[in-house]
Amino acid sequence: MGFLDLSWHPGECQADFGQVDVRYRGVVTRMRHFVLDFPYSNIGPSQLMPGENAECTCQALRNLFEWLGGVPERIVYDNAAGVGRKWFDRIRLTRLFQAFQAHYGFEYSFCNPYSGHEKGAVEARVGAVRRRLFVPVPGVWSLDNFNLRLPGRCLELGDKDHYRKGESQTGLFDEDRKALLPLPAKPFDVVTWTRMKADKYGNVTVQGRHRYAAGPEHAGHEMIVGLRALEVEILDAEGKRVITHPRSYGDKPTDSGDPSSQLGLLCDRPAAWRNSRVRDAMPDPLREWIDAQVFCFNVCSTGSAVFFRSVG
C-alpha cells in the first residue's frame, strides 16, 4: 500500500523535538531543539530548550508565536512528548498544555502511530536545523539571548525556492503568516504551580533528584513551587516570593543550595563550621584564616556567634 501525499494549507504546522549538543557556559551539554515546521512554505523556526517537558514545549511555542506575530491555526505533534502522556491508545494532556492551548486558541492533533510519512516534513526540518545551525557545536551563555536570534537564522536557511512549487519559500512563508490567528491581549505565563514540603534543611526536591534551597528558616514548612522552563520559583505558604533558582535537568542528582544561607544557623551552631558548606565554598587561604579565627573565638562561649554575624 502506498503513502498518502498530504496537502498542507497556509498557517498549519507540525511540531517536534530533536537532540543537539551545545557548549553551555563552557560545558558540552545535550539539549533539545524544538521545531515548528510550516510544510506549506517549508520554513521551520526553532527554539533551544533544556528538556522536553510541558514547560519547555509551551515556552518554546510562546516564544515562536511572539516572533511570528500570530498563532498557527493548527499544530500537528509527532508524539505526546511535552504535551501529555500516552494512556493505552489515548493521550492524556498535561494541565499546563490544556490551559496554554485554551489561551491561544489553536487546534491540535497527533500523528497516527506507525505513520512515519505523516511526520516526514518536520523530521526533515529537525535534521536540517541541527546540521546547519548546531554543527560545529555552538557556544551558548544565555538561552534567552540565543533563542531571540534562532528563528531569524532558521528563516535565512529557507531563503530559496520551494523544492516542489518552484516559488520563493520566504514568499510562501508570508502567506503562512497572513493565515495566523491573532495573539491574545496578554501572553500566557508558562508555569506549573505545585505545593511541596521543605525538608529539614529547607530544601524542596523536584523529580526526586533536583534539590532547590528555600533556606533553613523554611525547614518543614509547606512551600509553593513554580516550575518554569528555565527557572524554579519558590514562594512561602502565603504566596510571598522566597527565591528563584535556575532549573536543573538530567538524570544525575543536583543541589542548587546557596552556602551563604547557612550563615544564620552557624551563628547558633558554630561547632558545625568544620562541616558546613560555607567552609567548603571558600578558597584555601580564607578557609584556613577563618579556621584559626573560629578556634580563637571558641575560647569565649559567644565568640563564634559574634564572628559569623560579622561575616554575614
Give residue ranges: language-model regions.
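RNase H-like two-metal-ion nuclease catalytic core shared by retroviral integrases
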Residues: 77, 88, 108-130, 146, ...
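Protein C-terminal end segments and domain termini
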Residues: 234-312
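Active-site beta-loop-alpha junctions of metal-dependent nucleic acid enzymes
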Residues: 47-70, 74, 248-254
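Acidic/histidine-rich, metal-coordinating catalytic segments
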Residues: 70-89
